[in-house]
Amino acid sequence: MSFNTFGHMFRVTTFGESHGVALGCVVDGCPPRIPLTAAEIQRDLDRRKPGQSRFTTQRQEADQVKILSGVMETERGQVTTGTPIALMIENTDQRSKDYSDIKDKYRPGHADYTYEAKYGIRDYRGGGRSSARETAARVAAGAVARKVIPDVKVRAALVQMGPHKIDRANWNWDDVTRNPFFCPDATKAAFFEEYLDEIRKSGSSIGAVIEVVAENVPAGWGAPIYGKLDSDLAAALMSINAVKGVEIGAGFGAAELRGEDNADEMRAGNNGPVFLSNHAGGILGGISTGQAVVARFAVKPTSSILTPRKTVDRAGGETDILTKGRHDPCVGIRAVPVAEAMVACVLADHFLRHRGQNG
């Protein structure tokens, strides 16, 4: 299997499966002499790890990260050396027996059939590499990326669950840390609690929309045509499990606007142009404008539900399937820290590419 690596100058390779011994990543291209400790990486992993509320999978994983290479102790503390940084997270709470009854059946909505169609083999134990468990490694890599671009603030929030959207007038970033949904609207978070409880108890699942905002991105990152910043952001977010759509700035909403409404007008400021709106999401022509970079993505409902579903088996026979195991009733919740990590990695990559070309 190829395509386990992304990035150009800040390159991340992830490895491991849902029910394997461990998973992790190798970060190549991180500049030297950057302070980096396991505790800093752990803070991000703790936001993503499972089992923290009844609204996420009850699989209990500590997700303790180990730094295997790429750092050393100095008089300034632990810093990067410029060599590849290897990070490992052990799996400790696998229950592969939950999948033994369905190992020859293709789960609807999962990658079971497509993996087998491509490779002639698949890891049925929790989905193997197609499991969202893989994203723990991405979050670890994202923590390293944040250290490369310390002035850039990357934050994400859940802004819609099912058909229910937050009230943007109530947006408060502080509220994101005060509820289990990473929701910036405290009133809507209380509603989500009742709403998702009902869905969870029925054995079903629901989708969500996540918004990512990167502030303090200077003008000039990105490149025209095939190196566009928004193209790389879209690809990175689209690579997250269960994501089915990505938009930048006004996104699909721009199709409903007239030209005079969509184009972000400018006025002169002390340090360059001041934009009067941000429908472009902080990117024009594939290059950052200096405004906040804004992206949103849609996450489909978790495919593993407690309702019997129609499917086929490996022999081609028609059958029914009932998925066991422990699953998120709304996988969009834990996609929030994953999205931050992916955006941080892309921005760190573009920072290094910009510095390499322009000094």
Swiss-Prot record:
It is an enzyme of class 4 (lyase). One of its GO terms (molecular function) is FMN binding. GO terms for biological process: amino acid biosynthetic process; aromatic amino acid family biosynthetic process; chorismate biosynthetic process. InterPro entries: Chorismate_synth, Chorismate_synth_AroC_sf, Chorismate_synthase_CS. FMN binds at residues 129-131, 241-242, 285, 300-304, 326. Pathway: Metabolic intermediate biosynthesis; chorismate biosynthesis; chorismate from D-erythrose 4-phosphate and phosphoenolpyruvate: step 7/7. Reduced FMN (FMNH(2)). It holds the Pfam family Chorismate_synt. Its EC number is 4.2.3.5. NADP(+) binds at residues 48, 54. Its cofactor is FMNH2. The keyword Repeat does not apply. Keywords: Amino-acid biosynthesis, Aromatic amino acid biosynthesis, FAD, Flavoprotein, FMN, Lyase, NADP. GO terms for cellular component: cytosol. Coiled coil: none annotated. It catalyses: 5-O-(1-carboxyvinyl)-3-phosphoshikimate = chorismate + phosphate. Belongs to the chorismate synthase family. This reaction introduces a second double bond into the aromatic ring system. PANTHER family: CHORISMATE SYNTHASE. Homotetramer. This is Chorismate synthase. It comes from Afipia carboxidovorans (strain ATCC 49405 / DSM 1227 / KCTC 32145 / OM5). The gene is aroC.
